[in-house]
């Protein structure tokens, strides 16, 4: 038995309520995107987003290279702010991003603005993400644009 921790997975076919498909949908409709920020409204929350393909590759790597009884964090290659993510999506779509920073924390005390895992143990074992972050976002956005019906669910 090995324990694997993962967070902020994304990819093709992700439910539209999640941040990345929600951004794609709102940008397509020229709607405003509300970005959760710190109370100063200058800095948005951050995540270590990771594509489902990279998660699957990490699990397969651990099956052959991991040690039974150990815990492993599977994380993305870098920390990305939610604003940066929305800007990347708009850029891939060739659209303008209409957004507003909101202090969501005051409405939801305890809401986490930063999700992060230290994946250095896995990377230190020689694991390499097979698909880089920018390529993963581009593929996800393009797939969603080619399958807009998916945004209706």
Specify the residue positions occupied by each region the protein language model found.
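Residues in soluble alpha-helical coiled-coils and helical-bundle/repeat scaffolds
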Residues: 11-15, 127-128
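Active-site loop immediately N-terminal to the catalytic Tyr-X3-Lys motif
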Residues: 16-17, 66
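Conserved beta-loop-beta element that borders a ligand/cofactor-binding pocket
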Residues: 1-12
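C-terminal substrate-binding subdomain of Rossmann-fold SDR/epimerase-dehydratase oxidoreductases
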Residues: 27-153
């Amino acid at each position: 038995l090995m324990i694997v921790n993962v967070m902020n997975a994304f990819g093709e076919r992700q439910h539209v309520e999640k941040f990345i498909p929600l951004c794609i949908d709102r940008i397509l409709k020229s709607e405003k995107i509300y970005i959760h920020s710190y109370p100063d409204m200058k800095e948005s929350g951050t995540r270590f987003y990771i594509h489902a393909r990279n998660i699957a590759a990490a699990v397969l790597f651990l099956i052959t290279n991991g040690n039974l009884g150990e815990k492993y964090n599977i994380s993305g290659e870098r920390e990305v702010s939610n604003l940066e993510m929305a800007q990347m999506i708009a850029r891939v779509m060739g659209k303008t991003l209409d957004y507003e920073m909101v202090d969501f924390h005051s409405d939801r005390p305890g809401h986490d603005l930063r999700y992060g895992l230290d994946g250095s143990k896995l990377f230190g074992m020689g694991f390499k993400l097979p698909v880089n972050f920018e390529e993963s976002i581009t593929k996800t956005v393009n797939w969603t644009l080619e399958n807009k019906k998916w945004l209706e669910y």
